Amino acid sequence: MINLRPLTENDLPFLLEVRNDDSTRQFLENNSKFTLKQSLKWFRETQPKWYIIEVNRFSVGYIRTNGDEVGCDIHPNFRKKGYAKIAYELYLKDKDYASLWVFEDNFAKNLYEKLGFVTNGKSITIRDRNYIQMEYNGK
């Protein structure tokens, strides 16, 4: 069973394990590595509305949110198993609108399109790659 639960301070070591992995960072706008000390400060100051993705109560990834923007990172050991798709479906089920940014060459773009996200024409260049915005307008 897959579910989303709010991120807690105790989840930060797991979050860093996923976030600081090179295979995750290559697809993030800010690809810096973070320390636990930096992450604790961030968590305590911002109280983010992020969610841990659990499969049978085992953490496999997380959903990032910032207002209407959403993103998802899955631990490298659990990718290509459909967890991101289900997590997005759970997160989006009650949403009228969401947006995200994705590198145009990121294979996850196909997933976003299947979920109903469409490109809106906004793009920027980051590290010589095209970073595009996609929007979801409910179902």
Question: Which residue stretches match the model-derived regions?
Answer:
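A conserved beta-strand-loop-helix scaffold within acyl/acetyltransferase catalytic domains
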Residues: 61-68
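A short, internal acetyl-CoA/4′-phosphopantetheine-binding micro-motif in the GNAT/acyltransferase core
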Residues: 69-83, 102-103
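Conserved beta-hairpin
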Residues: 49-61
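Conserved acetyl-CoA-binding loop-helix of GNAT-fold acetyltransferases
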Residues: 80-94, 110-114
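Short hydrophobic/aromatic beta-strand or adjacent loop that forms the aromatic wall/cage
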Residues: 48, 129-134
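Conserved beta-strand-loop-alpha-helix junction that forms the acyl-donor binding cleft
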Residues: 99-113, 117-118, 124-130
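A short, well-structured alpha-helix characteristic of acyl/acetyltransferase catalytic modules
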Residues: 1-33, 37-41
